[in-house]
């Protein structure tokens, strides 16, 4: 919380097993008035269950540091098609609509070009949307659990600076390879344990 810019936004991605705990924690940390959205990232891929409703979504909790001065630019985000285009004018159907708090976006294909091989890789489209809406060109984006480096890849593509943090050596190798392949200049720093 202390390092978040006054106009900054926190996006926390979780699955159904943890989101309710995190919501209570973040309400206590930020204050309930700083809760902006609960985004549902829905996808149609993964496990099938006959004993319960199959889980086909993740949750992204969105908090702002200051509800009076946070940055949000919905016009920077790609529009999406109407689900029932016949119910709106042809002009509106062609223009599309702004995304709501339910994002239909496939997971990263196991055979697609975007795949890095990292097990919990997030799609570039999801991070692009988050970064476009909540930051300006030149802003700093921070990911404490960088995984496959999707946040850095999207930030670089959109002209944002970024800091990626992860302690997993596999993650660091994937991120380094991904950013090098993308032609992104970066500096790798290893944390040194500190005695307290």
Where are these regions (language model features)?
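PRPP-dependent phosphoribosyltransferase catalytic core
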Residues: 170-196
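Core catalytic lobe of class I
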Residues: 1-174, 181-182
């Amino acid at each position: 919380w202390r390092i978040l810019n006054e106009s900054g936004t926190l996006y926390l991605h979780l699955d159904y097993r943890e989101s309710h705990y995190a919501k209570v924690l973040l309400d206590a940390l930020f204050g309930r008035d700083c809760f902006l959205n609960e985004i549902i990232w829905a996808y149609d891929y993964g496990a099938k269950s006959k004993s319960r409703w199959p889980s086909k979504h993740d949750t992204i909790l969105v908090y702002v540091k200051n509800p009076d001065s946070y940055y949000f630019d919905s016009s920077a985000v790609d529009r999406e098609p109407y689900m029932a285009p016949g119910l709106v004018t042809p002009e509106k159907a062609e223009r599309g609509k702004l995304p709501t708090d339910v994002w239909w976006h496939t997971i990263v294909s196991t055979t697609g070009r975007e795949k890095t091989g990292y097990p919990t890789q997030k799609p570039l489209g999801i991070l692009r949307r988050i970064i476009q809406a909540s930051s300006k060109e030149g802003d700093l984006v921070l990911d404490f659990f960088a995984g496959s480096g999707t946040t850095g890849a999207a930030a670089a593509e959109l002209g944002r600076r970024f800091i990626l943090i992860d302690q997993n050596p596999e993650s660091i190798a994937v991120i380094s390879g991904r950013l090098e392949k993308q032609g992104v200049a970066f500096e790798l720093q290893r944390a040194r344990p500190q005695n307290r």
